[in-house]
UniProtKB/Swiss-Prot annotation:
Pathway: Metabolic intermediate biosynthesis; chorismate biosynthesis; chorismate from D-erythrose 4-phosphate and phosphoenolpyruvate: step 7/7. The keyword Lyase applies. NADP(+) binds at residue 46. It catalyses: 5-O-(1-carboxyvinyl)-3-phosphoshikimate = chorismate + phosphate. It comes from the Bacteria. Signal peptide: none annotated. GO terms for biological process: amino acid biosynthetic process; aromatic amino acid family biosynthetic process; chorismate biosynthetic process. The lineage of its organism: Bacteria, Pseudomonadati, Campylobacterota, Epsilonproteobacteria, Campylobacterales. This is Chorismate synthase. It comes from Helicobacter pylori (strain HPAG1). This reaction introduces a second double bond into the aromatic ring system.
């Protein structure tokens, strides 16, 4: 499937080395002011070629809006948008056109569809994630209207873990590091991987909070059973290239605790802790939503590796091209966009949860 969302639905199309990639975002309400500066900034955050820690491939990533916007406001109809691919180098893949790159999707895509699109991974390339970032920018415009903001950064690279989380620092950091004190060690780990023609894994932290620090998030976003908020968040994150695990709140650590250690106690002002990561029973509880996303090392490394070709013959694979040494870095921006899309979707879906909401809409005139 190529569509994400229940009410606010994003459908994407295109390949890494095709003429363009694009998306259709259906379900956006009318009357939302389109913030072109925000859209451009989001695309630049994900953009390659900015420093030595990410891919050298630098696309312009100019978003061309083709529908759903009139005089700088959303019209309520599907928002269509395109991003042209201008700096693809398909010749870098000529030597592996009949090979399966280890730990890439080449093998599974070929056996499922019978087509070997070797040009940068085709549809399975992380290039497609640029569309998710563009769509996430539109979702952020919606969330801003009701006081919700999403933020992200890197908390771990190669086992070097952040001790403190500073989202303002992450915005200025070359690797979106949340901890200034650990940043240099994390950078060194990436540089060592590059020197060894290797790659390295990492963990991104994404959170949603109220724009106003003294206010809570809306309570009740998400459904109790088959559209749980945490399930939809995990689904969106796991649909991103290279993601191998998603944690909400304490996540895996929860399985090591007793109930007396894990439970979030309450007083008249609210919760006294947030080990649940802002989600209870599949719905937001008003606290910050905390998500950790674990990325595997980039499978594209510049070392000789054993593999097979499309005829099942054993051979050696030696890659060329331009690749991220740590996909978690730019991946953190995509995860932030995905959380924005999921929350915007749940906000719109929540309008049907009480008859009072519908009466407010339809009886106001």
């Amino acid at each position: 499937m190529n569509t994400l969302g229940c009410f606010l639905r994003l459908t994407t199309f295109g390949e890494s080395h095709g003429d363009m990639i694009g998306g259709v975002l259906d379900g956006m309400p009318s009357g939302i002011k389109i913030d072109y500066a925000l859209l451009e900034n989001e695309m630049k955050r994900r953009q390659g070629g900015r420093n030595v820690f990410i891919t050298p491939r630098k696309e312009d990533d100019k978003v061309e809006i083709t529908s759903g916007v009139f005089e700088d406001f959303s019209t309520g109809t599907p928002i269509g948008f395109l991003i042209h691919n201008q700096r693809a180098r398909s010749k870098d893949y000529d030597n592996i056109k009949n090979l399966f790159r280890p730990s890439h999707a080449d093998f599974t895509y070929f056996h499922k569809y019978g087509i070997r699109d070797f040009r940068g991974g085709g549809r399975s390339s992380a290039r497609e994630s640029a569309i998710r970032v563009a769509a996430g920018a539109f979702a952020k415009m919606l969330l801003r209207e009701i006081g919700i903001v999403c933020e992200s950064g890197i908390i771990e690279i190669g086992g070097i873990e952040a001790k403190n989380y500073d989202f303002n620092h992450a915005l200025k950091s070359e690797i979106f590091a949340l901890d200034k004190e650990q940043e240099e060690a994390q950078k060194t780990a990436i540089q060592n991987a590059i020197k060894n023609h290797d790659s390295i894994g990492g963990v991104a932290l994404i959170r949603a909070r109220s724009v106003k620090r003294n206010q809570k998030l809306p309570i009740g976003l998400g459904q109790g059973l088959y559209a749980k908020l945490d399930a939809k968040i995990a689904e969106a994150m796991m649909g991103l290239n290279g993601v191998k695990a998603v944690e909400i709140g304490k996540g895996v650590e929860s399985s090591l605790l007793k109930g007396s250690e894990y439970n979030d106690l309450m007083d008249q002002k609210g919760f006294l802790s947030n080990r649940s990561g802002g989600v209870l029973g599949g719905m937001s509880n008003g606290e910050e939503i905390i998500v950790r996303v674990h990325f595997k090392p980039t499978p594209s490394i510049f070392q000789p590796q054993q593999t097979i070709d499309i005829n099942n013959h054993e051979c050696e694979c030696l890659l060329k091209g331009r690749h991220d040494p740590c996909i978690a870095i730019r991946g953190s921006v995509v995860c932030e966009s995905l959380l924005s899309l999921v929350l915007a979707d749940m906000v719109l879906l929540n309008l049907t949860s009480k008859i009072e909401y519908l009466k407010t809409i339809y009886n106001e005139n």
